[in-house]
Amino acid sequence: MEKFRIDFKKENGPKYIQLYKHIKNLIENSKIEASEKLPPLREMSAFLNINISTSVKAYDLLEKEKYIYKKEGSGSYIYPQASASKEVLKAVRFDLANPQANMFPVDKFKEAVAIAIEKEGETLFDYHEGLGYEPLRMSLCDYMKSLSIESEPDRIQIISGAQQGINIIVNSILNYGDVVFIEEPSYPGAIDVFKEHGVKVVGIPVLDDGIDIGILKLKLEKIKPSIIYTMPNYQNPTGVCYSEKKKKEILNLAKQFDFMIIEDDYMSDFDFNNTKIKPLRAYDEENRVIYIKSFSKILMPGLRIGFMEMPIHVRNIISRIKYSMDISTSSFTQLSLYYYMTFFGWRNHLDIIKKVYESRFKIAKKYIDSNFSDILTFRKASGGVNFFAALPKDYSSIDLKIFLESKGVKILEGPLFYYNIKAENEFRISIAHMQENEIENNLNTLKNGIIEFLSDEKNKMKYKIPN
C-alpha cells in the first residue's frame, strides 16, 4: 500500500485529481503490474484519510481513460496495455488497418514534391480555389474512369480525408434530428460524426452480399431517412461486397423514397477474386450518390487527402461548408499529389498494392477457413484487409481484447462498430499492418490465445465494458 501514499497539497488541485495523477504515474512507470488489482475503494480511502467519493472519482477517471477496468463484484484492475507501452511496439497488431510504412512510395513522392516546389514556387504554399487544385481534379476525373465513373472537375471537392468528407456532408445536408440509416456493423469514424451532430441513426444489418434489403424496405416504409451511409465494396469491418443486384436495388429505393446516399470507398481499385467490381456511384443515373474516396489504403494515410464526387445541386453548400472548416486542403499536399500522379507511375503503384493486398487476403482467408471454424464464426469477406468474427454468445470481445493484450496480441472489439446495439461477442482483425510471411504465425498466435481464453469458464461475461 505504501506506493499509493500521497502528500496532498492544496495548490495541486482537487484531491481526486491528485490521486488520479499519482496512480496514472505509477502505471505508466510500471510501478504497478499489468492486470494487478487496485486496493478497494474503502481501503484506499482509509489509507489516505480521504472521503470515499474522492477515491470513486479518481477510479472513474482512470477507467474512462482506460488505465483500469472493473470486474463486477471483484474490483478494479490495471489494463494490460496501460503499463506495457514498450511492449505494444512488439505486439501482433491485428488492430491496425493502415498499410505498413514500407509500402509507401516515399522516394517517388519526394521527387514529386521537388518538382512541385520547382514549378510552382511560392504559390505552392498559397490557397487554391475552394473545390481544390483544378489540374488535380481533372486527373481525378481521369482516374475515376478506371472505376467506371464518368465525372467532371466541377463535381469534385478535394477533402482532408474521408472522415472530413462525412463531416462536411452532415453539416451541409442534415439538420439536427434528421434520420440517417447506416450499415451495422459500420465504420467507427462515421458513427462518431453522426453522434456528434445529433442526428437520429437507424442501423440496418449487413448480410453476406451487403445490406439487408428486406429490413431496409421495412424501415423505409416507417421512417424517412435523409441519407444512407454505406461502404458497398470490401465493407469495414466485414470485408463484404454488395452484389450488383443489391447496388441497383438501393439506388431504386433512393429514388422511390427520395433519399441521398453517401458511398465511402477505399478499396474499389482492387479485385480480389479476378472479378472487376464497380462502386455504387457507377450505377447512379439519378444524382443520388455522394462518392467519397480515401487514399489511406492505397497511398499514404498521413497525407490526409481524398475527394468527394457530388451531384451539382449540392456542390455550392458542400463547398461553403468545406471553406468554413479549413478554407481548403493543403495546397502543398494537393500539388505534390498531382505531380506524383502525373509523372511517377501512379497506376503502377496501384497494381503493386493490389498484388500485395490480394496475396495477404488469400493467405489469411485460407488459414482462417482451415483453422478457426470450430471456435469462431467469421463473416464471409470477399476481399480487403479486414475479417469480422464472433465468439460464442456468452463471451465478450472486451474480455477477449484484455486477455489477448496480456499475450501481446491486439484486436478491435465489436461494440466500436455499432451504434444501436452492443455486439459484445464480435471483433475485428486486420492483416494490413503485417508482412505476408508473418500472417500465418500471427493468426496461429491469435488462435491459441482464443482457445486458451475460451477454455476458462471464468472468462464468460464478467468484465464491465468501459465507456
Explain the meaning of each model-derived region:
Residues 1-116, 120, 125, 136, ...:
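N-terminal basic, amphipathic alpha-helical segments
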Residues 50, 67, 199, 225, ...:
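Short glycine/serine/threonine/alanine-rich loop segments
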Residues 73, 152-153, 380-385:
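Short Gly/Ser/Thr- and Asp/Glu-enriched loop/turn motifs at secondary-structure junctions
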Residues 123-257, 268-270, 275-283, 357, ...:
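Conserved core of the PLP fold type I
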Residues 182, 203, 261-263, 337, ...:
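Hydrophobic residues in well-ordered beta-strands that form the structural core
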Residues 229-231, 262-263, 269, 293, ...:
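Short beta-strand segments
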Residues 289-370, 377-381:
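PLP-dependent aminotransferase class I/II
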